[in-house]
Amino acid sequence: MSEIKIINGQSLPNIPWQERPADLEEGAVLWRYTENPVMGRNPTPKIGRIFNSAVVPWQDGYIAVLRGEQVNGVPHVYLGRSKDGIHWNVDRERVQFVDENGEPWMPNYAYDP
């Protein structure tokens, strides 16, 4: 890319990046990583697939909030951690929520982060 524009923010250090494919449709601003999927099936015994991750730099690597579809098909929110943004370790337990009184609360269905 000959010119990079940051809108309302600063550049994020060490974000994994692949250059724009030469055959990408004119005007397209997003493209898939050629090695997708980054996270394969069954990243933990209870999770069948990962969808719609929200990833940010954190400490000496990256942290992600993930929608993990459990093997029974019900989605819940999980955390993942990575040193390089490509290889991930996903927590085995779901994110624990609390209600407005600080009491433990677990939704029956937790979709996108």
Where are these regions (language model features)?
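Beta-rich carbohydrate-recognition and catalytic domains
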Residues: 1-111
